[in-house]
Amino acid sequence: MKIGANYTPSQGWFHSWLDLDIDATRRDFEGIAQLGLDHVRLFPLWPLLQPNRGLVRPRALDDVVSVVRAAGEFDLEVTVDALNGHLSSYDFLPSWVITWHTSNLFTDPLVKAGQTDLISQLATRLREEPNATGMTVGNEFPQYAALAPGHHHPTRSECTVDDAQTWLETMLGTMRDQWPDGRFWFGFDDDLWFVDDHPFTPRHAVTQGSATTVHSWVFAQVGPRFGEGHPALTWFPRYLLELARAWSHDPERPLWLQEVGAPRTHVPDSSSAAFMTTTMASLTSTPGLEAITWWCSHDVSRDLLDFPELEYSLGLFTKDGKPKPEALALSDMLPDLHNAQPQHQLDEPLEFSANWDTGAGRSVCSPMGDLFAQWVDQAEQTGRAPRLALRPTPGLTDREALASARAH
């Protein structure tokens, strides 16, 4: 199993792409490598890469390549998110899709042409770098279609389930065309698993891309429901992975825990190391789990204003590069994590019912529901993660779904 970090630059956060200091980047990567981590996930900003639909800036692409090569100096593999998009509550959208040029990010043909142009040029550059392994479409890009109460995007791009499918196939297909040997992913927040009418569905998650990604955050629902210190917080990432396995018709489908972190809203400093070790211990036996990527590498500086409070302290390192207790705990666990072996789950699964095609009914899996509470109780009683199983529902047959999954 690979263990890495989502790279948040210690100097200037993602605004550092404006005037890249490659020496500062090297210092960050040196610290990450000294912990024993083996990969980083990078987030160049879409408006800087492509300020006009017809202009993908060569200098901006050069900067991405420079950072990839700097990571390679410390034997770190790299994946790159293309359309960023959305990061830590802030949207980074180019001027040609907002305000007077407001356009639908998922259905407008001109916008999609611009997106594929950027992805194509970025993939063409990255495929030449030996430590670059692949690309994610963008960080939690489906949040631009979010419509759940409290999560409804203020300038939402409406789309249907079929529109979402077409958009994903177009973006991922462009990556494959330009980088045949690369690996490609679709990253999303957990609304996809829990919101019945979200146009991006679990079916998309488990059939699109090289592996199913999971983003595990306890600050939204699990923490508020169960409270600080409850076992549900450290079991939640495993629950999401089991949910991903339940939706997939392909038993060989790989999994990537692309984001998991310790928000201080529900994990105080005094518990951060224990949260790390307990969370990781729950993950080691997960069938198909090939990588875990902690969010994030470095704390956000307090000099940067107006972030949600929890965003300032999610790093493995302080902004000055000092490893925090959870970083040291992770480093100590690396031999066990690298050698982790999946365990067969022989117990009867906990079943739920939802529609394979549309995702309708998926809200039964929400952390606010009975299924999750029952799953956590059973995990605590047995010390093992229970399986989940999706009951047969109207939609594709198992044979058709498996063929679709393997085709993508």
Language model segments and positions:
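The substrate-binding groove and active-site-proximal loops of carbohydrate-active enzymes
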Residues: 11-22, 46-62, 99-114, 141, ...
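Glycoside hydrolase catalytic-domain groove-lining segments
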Residues: 158-166, 170-265, 289-290, 299
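Short, acidic/polar
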Residues: 17-33, 115-123, 192-205, 272-282
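N-terminal carbohydrate-binding accessory modules
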Residues: 1-39, 69-73, 77, 176, ...
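Aromatic-lined substrate-binding rim segments of carbohydrate-active enzymes
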Residues: 22-97, 157-186
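Active-site groove signature of glycoside hydrolases
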Residues: 41-46, 83-111, 115-158
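Aromatic-rich peripheral "rim/lid" segments of glycoside hydrolase catalytic domains that contact
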Residues: 16, 115, 282, 286-408
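Short, well-ordered coil/turn segments that N-cap beta-strands
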Residues: 1-3, 36-38, 72-78, 128-133, ...
